[in-house]
Structures are given as C-alpha cells and as structure tokens.
Amino acid sequence: MMTGPAGCGKTMAAKALTKGLNRPDYYFNLGATQDARATLIGNTHFDSKKGTFFSESAFVKAISTKNAVILLDELSRAHPDAWNILMTVLDQGQRYLRLDEAEGSPIINVAEGVTFIATANIGGEYTSTRVIDRAIMDRFTTIEMDVLNDEQEFGLLKYMYPNVNEEDLKAVAEIAHHTREVSKGGDGKLSTMVSTRASVEVAGLLYDGFNLFEAAEIGIFPFFSNDGGADSERTYVKQLVQKYVKDEKADEKLFTEPTEEDSETIVW
C-alpha cells in the first residue's frame, strides 16, 4: 500500500510499477464505488426469457487471472463494506472471494501470482476518507511516499515540459517546496501545500502560453483560503509567487480590483 499526501504521485507510481512488470493489470477506483458488492462481487439481473441470473464483476475476473496485478486506488475512500469483502481476498492464509449473490454461493480462489497494490490518503485534511481498518492495513506492506524536494520537482517538470523556460519551472518547483515546508512548520501560516499534481498543472499552463502569475491564479491560489484578507493564506502565497514574477504589473493584481476604465476595455 502506498500512502502519502494528495498529488504526490502514488497512483502514477503504482501504474508505472504495473506497466513495468509486464503482467495482466486491472484498475479499480474504490473511491468512486457506490455499491461495493456490485463492484467486487457482481449483480443479480432479471431477464424475461432467462429469468434471474447472476453476472460476475470485473473484480472476480481480475482475481481469477494468473499473475495479475490489481490496483486498488483510493482505498481510504472505500465504503467499509468493500473492506469486509476484501478481508478474505487479501489474507495470505485464505485468498478467496465468496459469491454470496450467486446460486450456491460459490467460492472463487485468488489465482496464483496475483498481486494487489493499493493507494490511500491518510490524515484529517482529506474529506470523505475513512480511518482504514487495522485488519486491512495488516494485509499490506505500507510504503510511505513523501513529497519531492525542489530539485526533484524541477527535474520532473523539466522532463515533462522540456520546452518551457527553465527559470519558470524552477520557480514553480521552489514555490511548491516552500509551501510544503511552511505547512509542515505548524505556525499556522499555511494549512495545505502545493502538490506535485498542481505543479504539473501549472507547468502545463506555462507550456500553453500563460505567464507564471496567470498560471498560479488558476493552478495554485484556489487551494488556499482567502479568509483574513491581507493576513490570509492566499495573500501569503500570492506574495510568495510575486517574488518570482518578472512582470511588474503583477504587483497590482495582488490587491487591486478592476477599475471602470479597465472594465471599458473588456470585450464580451
């Protein structure tokens, strides 16, 4: 199980691992699961000709595939019903799934070589997440993923967007790193940080022709609260970004509201 802050690359790393193993792979987003039993076991249907019949889920097919790699994404957002169903599947001493919706409640054994990889966000910052059952946690080896430092972040952004100005990419990496360090400090200046996912989004906007401040307005500022006015988290981050902005007019964007003269120049 890979745990860590949102946007630090857990799912990307898990998918890269799956691809690198060159084995059959299956992806299940448990955070988007409304009906755990239907997703993991299957559904009972009615047909006017066939009558009532049971349809196995894609998960049943996955665990029945030899040497399959199964990615259970957003495990911390899964309904407890999903955890209960997964208990026997993930237990090394059991490794089976009972299809209690099917006639006779047959047992499906997990095929030889099947590997499970899970991702989870753990912490009070994430809404709609649950404290993962200890019994589920014990069924995984946990890898705690940390955020990248500024040099690593810059290397990633440069790799993904080699044609973007290096100074701008370094600025994005340093801004992200600064917010991470401050949010860890506990002094109350920032309650959250710029994730790697957000950094990549900002780099993409730079590639599309936005300047740094414009990209930050879209990809960074909305994550920080505006409560408190001049003392707000958003103002703090805007001032941080401003240190890296070359456009002197961007200073005016920190606090200045559009004037009537400005509004007259806007073409709708």
Task: Specify the residue positions occupied by each region the protein language model found.
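Alpha-helical lid/collar subdomain of P-loop NTPases
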Residues: N149-W268
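AAA+ P-loop NTPase catalytic core and its hallmark functional loops
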Residues: M1-K170
